[in-house]
């Protein structure tokens, strides 16, 4: 069974948090933070079965704040997509494509222009461990200690795809794209790559790709 993340109304629903965990949960990036299960009391075991950790996040947009303030309890949160498919962008597509998965829809009049999964992080013994770098952190540049004389485009692998632009001493990672066996995911990869190249006025001198299948 795939583990699920939960959203809690505020920090009062958690206990024994380390200072860095509190800082991450309340940061503007608002990632999912993996916490030891004892820090999240009164949660059903089947949300993250056979695991020692559970993903937790706080509301990060007005609709989420209104929803969590109304129900005043933790809610399971997952992306609006069928397995292997990218999240849908429009309300009408959600109603059409997810009718076998959802009983009710809470819709919004603000269109989604760019897909971005929730970032996933944990506090490790030696600092922050980023498991999925996406919403809240992308497209921030990552400073590097070395300098590149070429513009490099790294297209990544076919599974769990993420691409990267390398210029001078900066790396620019895309958000998590997904498994490129799916045609819609490949379209998302192409659209995001074009957007990043436009934003950063980036033209690659070298293109790298991991061609090992199933990686």
Tell me the role of every PLM-derived stretch.
Residues 1-215:
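Active-site-adjacent structural elements in enzyme catalytic cores
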């Amino acid at each position: 069974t795939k583990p699920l993340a939960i959203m809690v109304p505020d920090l009062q629903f958690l206990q024994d948090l380390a200072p860095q965990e509190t800082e991450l949960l309340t940061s503007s990036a608002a990632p999912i933070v993996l916490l030891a299960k004892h820090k999240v009391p009164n949660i059903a075991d089947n949300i993250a079965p056979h695991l020692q950790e559970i993903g937790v996040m706080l509301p990060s947009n007005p609709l989420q704040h209104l929803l969590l303030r109304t129900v005043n309890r933790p809610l399971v949160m997952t992306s609006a997509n069928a397995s292997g498919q990218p999240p849908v962008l429009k309300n009408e597509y959600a109603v059409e494509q997810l009718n076998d998965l959802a009983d009710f829809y809470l819709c919004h009049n603000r269109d989604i222009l760019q897909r971005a999964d929730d970032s996933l992080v944990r506090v490790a013994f030696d600092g922050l461990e980023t498991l999925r770098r996406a919403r809240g952190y992308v497209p921030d540049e990552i400073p590097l200690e070395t300098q590149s004389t070429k513009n490099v485009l790294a297209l990544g692998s076919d599974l769990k795809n993420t691409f990267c632009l390398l210029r001078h001493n900066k790396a620019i990672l895309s958000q998590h794209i997904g498994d490129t066996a799916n045609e819609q995911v490949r379209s998302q990869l192409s659209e995001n790559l074009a957007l990043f190249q436009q934003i950063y006025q980036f033209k690659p001198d070298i293109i790298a790709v991991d061609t090992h299948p199933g990686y």
